[in-house]
Amino acid sequence: YSAEKWATLRDNIMEYGELADLIHEYNPTVLSNRSTYKDQKNKNLNDIYDDYMKDIDDIWDQADNADNDVTWASLRYSAGLLTKQADNNYEDAEMEKIQYDQQEAKLVYQAQEMMVSLEQSAYNLENLQSTRDLLQQQYEATQAQMSVGMATQTDVLTALKSVQDQDTAILTAKKSQENVHRNLCLMLGWSADAQPEIKEVPQP
């Protein structure tokens, strides 16, 4: 990355267009996978393969000297297993790289979905609060009506319950929003209680 690009990734601003880079650089799972892959690559795979081949040759020598068919068959089976393991180990590092890349792509997609969800939850909370304000007005109006004999105690209690139910819905929505916010921050390298500035998701 350029110095300017690094600066934008570290500016405490969460932008939709930067999610892939943030995942690549700061996601704990991606960082762990990258470390594991480097360790695997640092091993001399050719030496490991050669060691397997030597072991297999030794087994074949034992098989040639086997004094019965059962021993020969058993050694031949062992040689076959080792050959398969040698081939698998030789390919493991690159296969892991492919799997890690696929996992990283999935994490980017999840982060994108979560950022969209976070924006939608903000609109949802606004609507819930607007509805709550209306229900509060209705409750107060019902109280006023009861004072002049135009509504019953039951009407007042029903109106009050509507306000309380709406408060519960708002609380649930806020908790859900906080969970998404916290998990998204952790995915992108921020702390769980971080409060980065979150930009709007661009329109498709």
Model-derived features with residue positions:
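Charged, solvent-exposed structural "stalk/scaffold" segments
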Residues: 124-172
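Short amphipathic coiled-coil heptad-repeat segments
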Residues: 176-199
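Helix-turn-helix repeat elements of alpha-solenoid scaffolds
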Residues: 88-94, 132-136
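Extracytoplasmic/secreted envelope proteins and their assembly/folding machinery
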Residues: 16-20, 115, 136, 160, ...
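Bacterial Sec-pathway N-terminal export signals of envelope proteins
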Residues: 1-60, 64-67, 71, 78, ...
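Amphipathic alpha-helical coiled-coil segments
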Residues: 82, 86, 96-103, 165-181
